Design a protein with these regions (language model features):
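Short, structured patches in soluble enzyme cores that scaffold and shape functional sites
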Residues: 136, 169-174, 196, 226
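Internal, well-ordered alpha/beta segment that forms a basic, Gly-enriched binding/recognition surface
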Residues: 113-156
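A cross-kingdom feature marking solvent-exposed beta-strand/loop segments within repeated
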Residues: 33-47, 64-88, 92-121, 152-160, ...
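Short helix/loop capping segments that flank catalytic or ligand/cofactor-binding pockets
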Residues: 23, 95-96, 132-135, 142-144, ...
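N-terminal beta-strand motif that seeds the catalytic metal site of vicinal oxygen chelate
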Residues: 1-19, 81-84, 141-181, 191, ...
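Core segments of cupin and vicinal oxygen chelate
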Residues: 3-57, 100, 109-115, 123-126, ...
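Conserved oxyanion/phosphate-binding beta-strand-loop segments in alpha/beta enzyme cores
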Residues: 49-68, 136-151
Length: 262
């Protein structure tokens, strides 16, 4: 049986400078600043800016000390995606089911509370250093999560027509694609949607293999790529070398008018 996932909840990036990243996503992509956590809200060791456009929620998080785990992550990988958070009915059940089926725990279930209600969260590990956090928020009406305060952009956001997250692509090592596809099938109950081989996706110089897995309602889609032989280094191999591990290659977002958006 699949782990019941309703949709994406948010995507969290670990970055070197959260404020500058937030300004970039607001200015270039028209995201709206909706929430904040940092020293001003009582969080001493890290700072997070929460941005939204349509149904897409991005969290940009930076460390405030060089010893912090987030600083280590940024030092090794550069800016990148740490958490692909999934919106669920029952975070504890989703977590327990995943663990029983062989997933590795990243964060045991916690309940966060403030004047807006409660949110339950738990997380498992996937490829590279990436996490999936299960977020149960049916009893919450705050701006984002307990611990965050509502914020507004200093200047009005100019949305560019981004509507929702279509898919999130993972790049994994040669020979690891089937292992991670099996992980999503066995642990999360995802279905294999489509397979691309190097004949489908290649240029004269670079090639890749890809399999796409999807949850029950089709809202959450994860293509998993691995390198394939080409005349030159595969773009997937190139990513693995630069990022120093498997990780999220790109996030695809939907728009009704791609020319206007671009």
């Amino acid at each position: 049986l699949p782990v019941k996932i309703l949709d994406y909840d948010h995507i969290e990036f670990y970055v070197g400078n959260a404020k500058q990243s937030a300004l970039y996503y607001q200015a270039a992509f028209g995201y709206e600043w909706i929430a904040y956590r940092g020293p001003e809200t009582g969080c001493r060791d890290k700072v997070s800016y929460v941005l939204r456009q349509g149904k897409i929620t991005l969290v940009l998080t930076a460390a405030l000390s060089p010893e912090h785990e987030i600083a280590r992550h940024v030092h090794l990988h550069g800016d990148g995606v740490k958490v692909l958070a999934l919106w669920v009915d029952d975070a504890e059940k989703a977590f327990q089911t995943a663990i029983e089926r062989g997933a590795e725990a990243a964060m045991k279930p916690v309940t966060l509370e403030d004047e807006h209600g409660t949110v339950k969260m738990a997380a498992i590990k996937t490829y590279g250093e990436t996490w999936h956090t299960f977020v149960e928020r049916s009893d919450y009406d705050g701006p984002f999560l307990p611990g965050f305060e509502a914020r507004r952009s200093a200047y009005p956001a100019k949305p560019v027509g981004l509507k929702f997250v279509d898919h999130c692509v993972g790049n994994v090592e040669l020979g690891a694609m089937n292992k991670w596809v099996k992980f999503y099938q066995d642990v999360m109950g995802f279905k294999l949607l489509i397979t691309f081989d190097d004949k489908d996706i290649s240029t004269e110089y670079t090639a890749l293999m890809s399999k796409v897995v999807s949850n029950g309602n089709g809202y959450v889609k994860f293509p998993i790529n691995e390198p394939a032989q080409g005349k030159k280094k595969s773009q997937i191999e190139e990513y693995l070398d630069f990022y120093r591990s498997a990780g999220v290659q790109h996030i695809a977002v939907a728009t009704d008018d791609i020319i206007r958006t671009v």
